[in-house]
C-alpha cells in the first residue's frame, strides 16, 4: 500500500462528524470526484468515483446517516495499469440529488438550469473545524502525497483554475505556502517542503502518518549530515595529504641541490621531522620540535621551505 493510501485510510477513520463538518468534507470530495449526470426526461443523478474503499464507506455513511439519501454502489475495474477496483456511489433519486447539491453547494440549481459553483462557500466553510474538514475532503477526493523516503511532494488536483486558487488560499490560511500550477488540462495545488507537508497532515488529522513522515525526515537529515561530515573530512584529508606530498618533494629537492645542512636550524629541524613523519598533522609536527611550535608556526616554516625549493627549481629549471 502506498503512503498516500495509508494517509487516506487513516483520515477516513475520523467518521464521527457533526453535520457541518460532514457537509464541508463531502462538498470537497464531490468537487474532485463527483459527476452530475442527466438522463432521459431531464432526470438528474450524481456519481462519486474513487479507488479507495475507505473513502467509499465514509461517503456512504454520510449520505445515509446524515442526509438520509439512498445510494447504490457499483464496482468496476480501473482502466489503469494496476487494474484496481473503482467504487462508484450512484444517486439516482432526483430529490436526493437536489438535496445533496443544496447541502454541499457544489452546483447552484436555478430555474433555467444548473451552474457549477467554483467558490468555496462561506456557508460551508466558516470556522476551524469546517475549514479542516474541507481540506480533508479535498485530499480524499483529489489529493496525493509521495513516499517521503523518495521525495517530499503533496498535491491536490482540480480542473478549474478559480477553484484551485480558492483551495490554495484556504490551505495557506494555516501558514502554509502551497502554490498552483497548470498540468495539461488540470490545475495542481502543491507543497514540496517536508515540514509543510507535516503541517498539512496534522491539519487533516493524519497523525500516525505525520509521525512516520517525521521519523523519515529525521533519518534523512541524519544521513545528509553524516554525508556532509564525511565529505568534509575526506576533502580535508585529501588537502592534508596533498600538502604533505608537496612538502616532502620540496625537502627532497633542497636536500639534493644544496643539502639540508645549508638551511637555518629551525627550518632544518622542521624538514628532518617532516621526512621522518610524513603522515602526521601540523599540530603533531609542532609538538615534536624542541621547543614545541604551534600549528601556525609549523605552517609558516613549511611554507618557507617550499619557497626555497621553488627558487631552487627556477634556478635549475627542474
UniProtKB/Swiss-Prot annotation:
Which ranges of the sequence are annotated as binding DNA?
281-314
PROSITE patterns recorded for this chain? INTEIN_ENDONUCLEASE
What InterPro entries does UniProt report for this protein, alphabetically? Answer: Homing_endonucl, Intein_endonuc_central, Sporu_reg_WhiA_N_dom, Sporulation_regulator_WhiA, Sporulation_regulator_WhiA_C, WhiA_LAGLIDADG_dom
Which SUPFAM superfamilies does the record associate with it?
Homing endonucleases
GO: which molecular function terms? DNA binding; endonuclease activity
**What is the residue range of the signal peptide feature?**
none
Q: Which HAMAP family match?
A: HTH_type_WhiA
Spell out the protein name for this chain.
Answer: Probable cell division protein WhiA
Q: Which organism is it from?
A: Clostridium tetani (strain Massachusetts / E88)
Amino acid at each position: 500500500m502506498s503512503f498516500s493510501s495509508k494517509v487516506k485510510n487513516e483520515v477516513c477513520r475520523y467518521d464521527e462528524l457533526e453535520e457541518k463538518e460532514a457537509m464541508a468534507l463531502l462538498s470537497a470530495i464531490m468537487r474532485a470526484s463527483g459527476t452530475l449526470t442527466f438522463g432521459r426526461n431531464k432526470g438528474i443523478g450524481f456519481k462519486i468515483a474513487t479507488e479507495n474503499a475507505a473513502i467509499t464507506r465514509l461517503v456512504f455513511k454520510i449520505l445515509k446517516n446524515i442526509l438520509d439519501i439512498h445510494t447504490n454502489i457499483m464496482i468496476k475495474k480501473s482502466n489503469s495499469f494496476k487494474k484496481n477496483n473503482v467504487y462508484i456511489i450512484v444517486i439516482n433519486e432526483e430529490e436526493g440529488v437536489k438535496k445533496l447539491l443544496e447541502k454541499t453547494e457544489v452546483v447552484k440549481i436555478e430555474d433555467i438550469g444548473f451552474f457549477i459553483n467554483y467558490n468555496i462557500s462561506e456557508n460551508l466553510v466558516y470556522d476551524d473545524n469546517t475549514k479542516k474538514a474541507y481540506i480533508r475532503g479535498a485530499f480524499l477526493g483529489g489529493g496525493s502525497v509521495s513516499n517521503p523516503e523518495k521525495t517530499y511532494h503533496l498535491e491536490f488536483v482540480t480542473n478549474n483554475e478559480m477553484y484551485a486558487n480558492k483551495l490554495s488560499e484556504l490551505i495557506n490560511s494555516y501558514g502554509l505556502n502551497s502554490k498552483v500550477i497548470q498540468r495539461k488540462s488540470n490545475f495542481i495545488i502543491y507543497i514540496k517542503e517536508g515540514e509543510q507537508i507535516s503541517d498539512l497532515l496534522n491539519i487533516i488529522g493524519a497523525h500516525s502518518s505525520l509521525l512516520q513522515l517525521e521519523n523519515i525526515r529525521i533519518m534523512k537529515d541524519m544521513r545528509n549530515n553524516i554525508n556532509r561530515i564525511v565529505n568534509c573530512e575526506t576533502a580535508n584529508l585529501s588537502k592534508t595529504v596533498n600538502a604533505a606530498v608537496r612538502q616532502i618533494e620540496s625537502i627532497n629537492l633542497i636536500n639534493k641541490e644544496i643539502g639540508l645542512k645549508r638551511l637555518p636550524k629551525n627550518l632544518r629541524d622542521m624538514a628532518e621531522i617532516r621526512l621522518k613523519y610524513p603522515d602526521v598533522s601540523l599540530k603533531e609536527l609542532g609538538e615534536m620540535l624542541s621547543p614545541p611550535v604551534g600549528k601556525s608556526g609549523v605552517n609558516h616554516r613549511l611554507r618557507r621551505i617550499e619557497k626555497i625549493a621553488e627558487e631552487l627549481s627556477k634556478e635549475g629549471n627542474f
